[in-house]
Design a protein with these regions (language model features):
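Long amphipathic alpha-helical repeat/alpha-solenoid cores
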Residues: 1-202
Length: 202
């Protein structure tokens, strides 16, 4: 716990509060290594109210998550403990309006919980941008169900990935076609893309 205290030193939390939250996270099933990473990503979680976090966990279980899934999601996005259930529920409803089923939103958020931290207008802009590239709305929905992390990439990152692939002699039409079936290409380094494409063509 000493390393966590060092990370939190600038926040002025007293040792008793840190220990209470530390013990709470340990009891939930987090390891010390996981808590250190969480403290680095969002140190304020060690100042959150324990009763509020417990309530959040119980409400998320009602939405369809297991405790193990919540632990995994909050390792990626520890600030989820600071989001209200109302905001999470609203995000699920907003994404249903985009074309997902409730079950699909739950499923993709398990892989990319960061979507709960993105404004719905940000998601809409990402969809509109991808439509401008040549994808159909239903293709984008399918791609993001298969590879939800696309939503966490900035538009500039996607633009750069397309430019990098064009340097490999692929046209934009080629790239659109390839990524429809394999959207995880957007998550590869340019060094790995060529090998992946060659493997797909064999």
């Amino acid at each position: 716990m000493e390393e966590i205290k060092k990370i939190l030193n600038h926040l002025g939390y007293d040792d008793e509060k840190i220990k209470k939250n530390y013990d709470f996270f340990i009891a939930l099933g987090y390891t010390q290594e996981e808590m250190i990473k969480m403290a680095k990503r969002n140190p304020k979680i060690f100042g959150y109210n324990i009763e509020n976090m417990q309530y959040k966990i119980e409400e998320m279980k009602k939405l369809g998550y297991t405790q193990e899934e919540i632990i995994t999601m909050t390792q990626i996005l520890p600030q989820m403990y600071g989001y209200s259930i109302e905001n999470i529920t609203q995000k699920i409803e907003d994404m249903q309006e985009l074309g997902y089923t409730r079950e699909e939103v739950i499923k993709l958020s398990k892989i990319a919980p960061q979507i709960y931290g993105l404004a719905i207008n940000t998601l809409k802009r990402k969809i509109e941008y991808m439509e401008s590239l040549g994808y159909l709305r239903e293709e984008i929905i399918k791609m993001t169900k298969d590879f939800p992390k696309i939503y966490t990439y900035g538009i500039e990152n996607i633009q750069q990935k397309i430019k990098d692939m064009q340097k490999l002699s692929y046209t934009q039409e080629d790239i659109i076609k390839l990524t429809k079936g394999n959207p995880n290409i957007y998550g590869y380094s340019i060094e790995n893309i060529q090998q992946k494409i060659e493997d797909m063509q064999e």
